[in-house]
Curated annotation (Swiss-Prot):
Record has Isomerase as a keyword: no
Function: Redox regulated molecular chaperone. Protects both thermally unfolding and oxidatively damaged proteins from irreversible aggregation. Plays an important role in the bacterial defense system toward oxidative stress.
Pfam families in alphabetical order: HSP33
Protein name: 33 kDa chaperonin
HAMAP family in the cross-refs: HslO
InterPro entries the UniProt entry points to: Heat_shock_Hsp33, Heat_shock_Hsp33_C, Heat_shock_Hsp33_N
Amino acid sequence: MSDYLVKALAYDGMARVYAAVTTETIKEAQRRHDTWSVSSAALGRTMTGTLFLGAMQKEDQKITVKIEGDGPIGPIVADSNAQGQIRGYVTNPHVHFSELNEAGKLDVRRGVGTSGMLSVVKDLGFGENFTGQTPIVSGEIGEDFTYYLATSEQINSSVGVGVLVNPDDTIEAAGGFMLQLLPGATDEIIDEIEKNLSTLPTVSRMIEAGETPETILAKLAGGEDKLQILEKIPVAFECNCSKERFGSAIISLGKEEIRSMIEEDHGAEAECHFCRNTYDFSEEELEKLYEEAK
């Protein structure tokens, strides 16, 4: 099944709810970055959370999320847009712990760390950026996104993200949900939401069992009849890197640096952090870039 995200309203229009299955997308990220179990879970959770923030944006806007904890994984970066395109990378892809956490799951908190920052940069188009930053509160990722939304954007939310990793480090299931209270939600609605959240199985297990974004939202809303589906968006790992972009980056290094590449290295190889694609530049190509540089 292809990955997709569903947007809906629930609780008499008093809550905005999103759910997504991202299994194939996170499989692609795992394959490209050769991530081990804990790194896979952390990257997959971050990418799914970023996907939800991207889905909140207008058509030409983009979101970049960076989680910088004090754990061995190092910084995690993901970006997404309103079209469901998502990419990401983790600084140390090879983190695995033989011990599980107290809940019997991969110890993502230990990998990410419990001290650090979650930063969100919104590219609003026209050269305008908005940056929000909150401290890491748990290192489990979902709770950190929840805290960011409540603190930086003043939106009471609940974000649940999960990745089920097989013993051979391949991805079995991935996805998540996001619920946001809208102005006017009553105490009764809040109580009902809390009750439904408390009985919700873990996201990765629901997806492993074959649940879809629609059925996850129905569980979240307390019944399919209580949902108003608004939109369904395809989700995929997409990277917009290109040789032209890397050429522009090389030009920005300046003539001296490019001359060094030509005379000492006799060429250059650039690798995209997000997708691991590599681009080779010959001496002749570098000479052309040298002419364009200042």
